[in-house]
Amino acid sequence: KLNKPLYTVACHDDLTAADLVGRHLIGPNGTYWQDGPLTRAVREGGICYLDEIVEARKDTTVVLHPLADDRRILPLERTGELLQAAPGFMLVVSYNPGYQNLLKGMKASTRQRFVALRFSYPEPMLEQQIVMQESQIDAELAAKLVDLAGALRRLESDLDEVASTRLLIYAGRMISSGMPPLQVCRCCLAEPLSDDLLTVEALMEVARLYFAE
């Protein structure tokens, strides 16, 4: 709808500033400069989306600072350029706050340069519609999966992560393919949430309240 080029970067520990900005490469005619996704978005007035930004090192994300404040510039030290962001340029980052710890989290100086939106799980009726549409299952089964997810999410204090809408969609697809519902609950909802056998069995006890043997 925005009709803008979108550059998506999956952040990780080994991501460097050069991966975002660009680097010199060797070609048949010598060295040449190759723009990174951030630089291309800046030049074109596109959208640069950094997924799971807290996975990137803090010394990498500081390259965003002059772009994310009122300067709207990107210095390219290796070429000597000082790029002014083209009209329409957008910088979008995302992360799951539950993953943060003492070692992983956004620098305060980085976070304060962004407008923040907090997203929670969809309302049950909306989530049911999403699961129905994405996994092609009926309303009754989708409602059971969403209710089960709600029960599991209430156990979030005992789990590193709780059942996501994505997992419900996977479960719906596997049930519609013919796999027994309880086996699907184990494979798609219990096992992915914990490596501890006792915890998995406790989650399965909850699942048995919604799906018969």
Predicted regions and their residues:
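C-terminal regulatory/interaction module of P-loop NTP-utilizing enzymes
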Residues: 1-213
